[in-house]
């Protein structure tokens, strides 16, 4: 097989995987929000559906493709469904970018370990909090209270991400 043919197949494969990732980033949150749930906090904050597709894609998609999907997915989701809200959109995008880059780095270096997605999520939220605080000039310890609450709420989603990553790590070996 010629190099040009291999490159074409790679580009097509990456494009299809990227599109599938973006579609999953739109439809997984929609499915989660269709589940009847009463509470002041959206079910997505508990289950983290927006982070499932990038985790899976990190095993199949190039880092640049994953970054593009992490930008486009939430934007399309917002414009099609209104979720995440305009206020939360930049925060979600930053978190997804940091999360995707960390998970992709670990997967690419063949150092995937159980708990990497949970750790990447925690670090992504922490980095996002610091970046937003630095950009707005409101960098204080008070910023970390909502972060801690958000992490507590996200525990079921972190468990879901960990179960998915265990499956993916076993499958990739």
Task: Identify the residue ranges that each predicted region occupies.
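Membrane-helix interface "capping/anchor" motifs
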Residues: 56-70, 107-113
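Short, charged juxtamembrane terminal tails flanking transmembrane helices
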Residues: 1-6, 169-173
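Hydrophobic transmembrane alpha-helices
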Residues: 2-58, 64-65
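Helix-adjacent hinge/juxtasegments
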Residues: 67-104
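Central hydrophobic cores of alpha-helical transmembrane segments
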Residues: 65-76, 114-124
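Residue-level signature of transmembrane alpha-helical entry/exit and packing/kink sites
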Residues: 10-22, 47-51, 66, 88, ...
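Structural signal for membrane-spanning alpha-helices in multi-pass inner-membrane proteins
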Residues: 25, 29, 58, 77-81, ...
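Membrane-embedded alpha-helical hairpins and interfacial helices in multi-pass inner-membrane proteins
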Residues: 33-44, 86-90, 105-173
């Amino acid at each position: 097989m010629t190099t040009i043919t291999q490159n074409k197949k790679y580009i097509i494969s990456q494009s299809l995987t990227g599109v599938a990732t973006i579609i999953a980033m739109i439809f997984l949150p929609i499915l989660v929000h269709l589940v009847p749930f009463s509470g002041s906090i959206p079910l997505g904050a508990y289950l983290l559906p927006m982070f499932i597709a990038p985790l899976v894609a990190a095993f199949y998609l190039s880092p640049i493709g994953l970054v593009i999907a992490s930008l486009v997915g939430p934007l399309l989701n917002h414009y099609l469904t209104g979720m995440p809200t305009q206020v939360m959109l930049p925060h979600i995008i930053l978190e997804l970018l940091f999360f995707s880059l960390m998970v992709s780095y670990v997967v690419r270096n063949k150092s995937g370990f159980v708990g990497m997605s949970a750790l990447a999520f925690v670090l992504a939220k922490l980095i996002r909090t610091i970046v937003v605080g630095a950009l707005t000039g409101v960098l204080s310890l008070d910023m970390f209270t909502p972060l801690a609450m958000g992490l507590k709420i996200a525990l079921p989603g972190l468990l879901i991400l960990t179960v998915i990553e265990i499956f993916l790590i076993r499958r990739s070996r």
